[in-house]
Curated annotation (Swiss-Prot):
It comes from the Bacteria. The lineage of its organism: Bacteria, Bacillati, Cyanobacteriota, Cyanophyceae, Synechococcales. Belongs to the DNA glycosylase MPG family. GO terms for molecular function: alkylbase DNA N-glycosylase activity; DNA binding. CDD domains: AAG. The keyword Phosphoprotein does not apply. This is Putative 3-methyladenine DNA glycosylase.
Length: 199
């Protein structure tokens, strides 16, 4: 997909926002995975994390490298990286080209599938066969990955801190849909404060 075509994408306005705003706007949307054999799998986005320039936990905090280049791509470019030598994580570049800004898709809820399949970035990437080969690709109707709009009410949105970090640990830049069984890790204290329930 060309940059001009990307600018015409219906998702460009959503992903042109700062990561902290796009991360919320993506909740409830469907991540679409298309395979070469014609199969299509859709997962509802139920948990996200934001990473922005100036955030010490952001992969692009210091500089652009060959590994994190796609994070600096125009909004809608796919950034896939590997952790622990075996798990992959999918992110969507946001805000503007040449800026380190992206949303990590942390959990997906797949219809008619056990919740564990999408409960965490490594699990969802394994289920969708997402790896480094898709790094640098674009969201779009003819691409292996795309988005579809949310088609029913989101329910209760919880905001809390991100997971598995040693820097930027206090930033409340993780959001999830409380009613989804696919959320990778719940914050019961945040749920109590934001939903008015006891822990």
């Amino acid at each position: 997909m060309t940059t001009a075509a990307l600018l015409e994408s219906p998702w460009h306005p959503l992903l042109s926002q700062p990561a902290t705003e796009a991360a919320i706007a993506l909740l409830g949307c469907w991540l679409v995975r298309r395979f070469a054999d014609g199969r299509v799998i859709r997962g509802r986005i139920v948990e996200t994390e934001a990473y922005e320039a100036g955030d010490p936990a952001c992969h692009g905090y210091r500089r652009q490298t060959a590994r994190n280049r796609s994070m600096f791509g125009p909004p809608g470019q796919v950034y896939v990286y590997q952790i622990y030598g075996r798990y992959h994580c999918i992110n969507l570049a946001t805000e503007a080209a040449d800026l380190a800004s992206a949303v990590l898709i942390r959990a997906l809820e797949f219809p008619d599938t056990e919740a564990i399949a999408g409960a965490g970035p490594g699990r969802l990437c394994r289920f969708l066969a997402i790896d480094r080969q898709l790094d640098g690709s674009w969201l779009g109707p003819t691409s292996p990955l795309d988005l579809e709009a949310a088609d029913y009410p989101l329910g209760t949105l919880i905001q809390t801190t991100r997971i598995g970090l040693t820097r930027g640990v206090d930033l409340p830049w993780r959001w999830y849909l409380a009613e989804s069984p696919a959320v990778s890790r719940r914050d019961r204290r945040a749920e109590a404060e934001q939903m008015g329930v006891s822990v």
